[in-house]
């Protein structure tokens, strides 16, 4: 597992449940806990199906070294994901259906990763389902309010923001993917075309943030909340720009982490800005959340991998 990446699913869950308004502390912590853990269990599950390419790109991992048994990984990840879905379904039974859908997506992801036109989008819809599950668990509703500007923007940011993370992540595995017949976008069309596609994803994830914030500002939304949201939004945009500039300079797989790291920063920060619009009292907790992420990222054992 790469625990620093659990912050990606964690902030996705935070954004989803931020639409609920007032919640008990227990409910808030339970939803946060299972969304936070879901990345680790989901990653463990998908890793079981792509040992071939991971053995070349990440030979230091326990699974690729054979230190841990694949079947044990499958059991632990499946039980963990079942627990996460059960908690979210407890707060809203509709999440049982979405959980089954997400589980199917995780189990079949490797098949679609091999296709250049599918990988990032296929991964993104699974994460988007996690956002929707957190939304349903927090609000208790049976429908999605697409007329809510913040909610609609959240869908775009989660989908394209995560798609950009997936695509930039492919840049560190190009040689391994080529050798194992994973026809990802960088393998099929090269780094230059893939970088341009990444630029589009980055723009698609960034524009909705400012459209939402400034639309609310001109609609007499409390300026104190707007300012808090902008702290995260501007930092997120800066990280996005840094991501794209670095990605354009990547010429080897070993250099890709220079773009992947800020891409994760941008995802966490952009989602935090929208969560603040829904719940400004989470400003300090989200700063603490981000600082914890920085600490775990700093002490990760393999600096070239993320």
Language model features with spans:
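Multi-pass alpha-helical membrane architecture of UbiA-family
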Residues: 1-306
């Amino acid at each position: 597992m790469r625990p620093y990446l659990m912050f990606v699913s964690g902030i996705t869950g935070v954004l989803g449940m931020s639409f609920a308004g007032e919640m008990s502390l227990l409910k808030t912590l339970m939803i946060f806990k299972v969304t936070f853990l879901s990345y680790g269990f989901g990653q463990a599950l998908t890793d079981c199906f792509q040992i071939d390419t991971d053995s070349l790109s990440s030979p230091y991992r326990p699974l690729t070294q054979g230190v841990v048994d694949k079947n044990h990984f499958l059991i632990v990840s499946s039980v963990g994901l079942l627990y996460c879905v059960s908690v979210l379904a407890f707060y809203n039974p509709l999440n049982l259906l979405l959980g089954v859908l997400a589980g199917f997506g995780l189990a079949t992801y490797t098949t679609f990763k091999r296709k250049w036109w599918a990988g990032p989008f296929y991964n993104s819809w699974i994460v988007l389902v996690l956002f929707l599950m957190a939304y349903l668990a927090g609000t208790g509703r049976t429908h999605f309010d697409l007329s809510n500007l913040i909610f609609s923007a959240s869908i775009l940011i989660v989908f394209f923001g995560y798609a950009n993370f997936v695509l930039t992540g492919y840049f560190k595995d190009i040689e391994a993917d080529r050798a194992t017949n994973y026809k990802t976008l960088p393998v099929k069309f090269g780094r230059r075309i893939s970088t341009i596609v990444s630029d589009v994803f980055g723009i698609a994830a960034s524009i909705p943030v400012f459209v939402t914030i400034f639309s609310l500002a001109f609609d007499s939304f409390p300026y104190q909340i707007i300012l808090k949201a902008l702290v995260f939004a501007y930092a997120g945009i800066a990280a996005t720009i840094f991501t794209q500039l670095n990605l354009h300079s990547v010429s080897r797989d070993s250099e890709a982490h220079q773009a992947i790291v800020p891409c994760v920063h941008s995802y966490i920060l952009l989602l935090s800005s929208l969560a603040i619009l829904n719940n400004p009292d989470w400003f300090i907790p989200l700063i603490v959340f981000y600082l914890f992420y920085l600490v775990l990222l700093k002490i990760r054992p393999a600096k070239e991998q993320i």
